[in-house]
Structures are given as C-alpha cells and as structure tokens.
C-alpha cells in the first residue's frame, strides 16, 4: 500500500480571513504531497507567499512557507492509495508543474462556491478543487460533491489518518 498526503492549512492573512469567514471553516488551504515531510508538495495558491494577489499552480517550498507564515497551523492527512495511483498522481503533478504558467487560481470560482454553483474554466482551480480533480481521476474520492465545490472542510476525515502540527514540516 502506498500513501499520499494532504496538508490542510490555517493560513493567516487578510484574503484567508475572508475565505475563512464566508466559508465558515478553520482550514482554508490544501496542499497535495507525495511524502509525509511535504518535500514534494503542490497546490494552487500564492506564487510568492508574500504577495496574495498573484496565484496559480506552484510547488510549495516548506522553508519559504514557514518563514512567511510562522504561526500557521497544519493538519497533515495520510491517504492510502495503490502504487499505480500514486505514480499517476506524481505524473499529473509534474506535468502540471511544467505548465504552471498556463494554470491560474480560479478567483471567480470562489464566488461560484459561495453560491453553491459548479464552476470550471480550463486550467483554473482553487486549491481544493484541484486536489479533488486529481484524486478523483484516480478513483480516490474525498467528497461526493463536484470537484469545483470541494472545500478543505468538505474533505472527509473519516478515511484519512491525521495529526495536527503548528509548524510546517
């Protein structure tokens, strides 16, 4: 049995506080990682941790994130998968990373999410909609909702083993 890891993050900051307020949840950001230390982790979010308005698909660098958000809280979840599923996810992450400047954060998707409306434009995602789509393509469903409606709160913890940490690993 292989594993992938999902980090749910309580990101500080003005934009995150708006999302937290309107969605009513503690964790407002998700990261998909191939290892427990999050050394190979990807997400849709800030291209630079200090500039919230420029966002897209990025590899998350733990030292840079920890420096920008030293008070952030994390919930690291382990998800069982097959070796074939993990390899397919790895290939998708690497392919998308090569094309990262053609992939954008779906800011309009946040508005649709607030209205409970499905939303998709090619290569535009929120962090949690990307996670749901990538996993769903491999038959790993973290929510019964359409991928564009998945939020960090919608991730079902019942099949995830998790621990909380106050520091980015």
Question: Which role fits each region the language model picked out?
Answer:
Residues 2-4:
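Extreme N-terminal starter segment of soluble prokaryotic enzymes
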Residues 15-22, 70-148:
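Active-site nucleophile-His-acid catalytic modules used for acyl/amide transfer and hydrolysis
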Residues 158-165:
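Conserved small/polar residues in nucleotide/adenosyl-binding loops
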Residues 9-77, 111-118:
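Glycine-rich catalytic cores of cysteine/serine-nucleophile enzymes that process amide/ester linkages
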Residues 150-156:
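Beta-rich nucleic-acid/ligand-interaction surfaces
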């Amino acid at each position: 049995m292989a594993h992938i890891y999902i980090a749910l993050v309580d990101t500080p900051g003005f934009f995150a506080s708006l999302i937290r307020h309107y969605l009513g949840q503690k964790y407002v950001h998700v990261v998909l990682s191939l290892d427990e230390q999050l050394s190979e982790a990807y997400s849709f979010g800030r291209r630079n941790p200090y500039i919230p308005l420029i966002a897209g698909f990025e590899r998350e660098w733990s030292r840079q994130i920890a420096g920008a958000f030293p008070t952030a809280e994390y919930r690291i979840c382990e998800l069982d998968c097959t070796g074939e599923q993990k390899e397919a996810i790895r290939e998708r992450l690497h392919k998308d990373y090569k094309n990262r400047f053609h992939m954008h954060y779906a800011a309009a998707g946040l508005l649709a999410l607030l209205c409970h409306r499905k939303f998709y434009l090619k290569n535009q995602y929120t962090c949690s909609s990307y996670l749901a789509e990538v996993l769903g393509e491999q038959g790993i469903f973290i929510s019964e909702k359409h991928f564009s409606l998945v939020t960090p709160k919608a991730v079902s913890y019942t099949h995830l083993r998790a621990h909380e940490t106050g520091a980015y690993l």
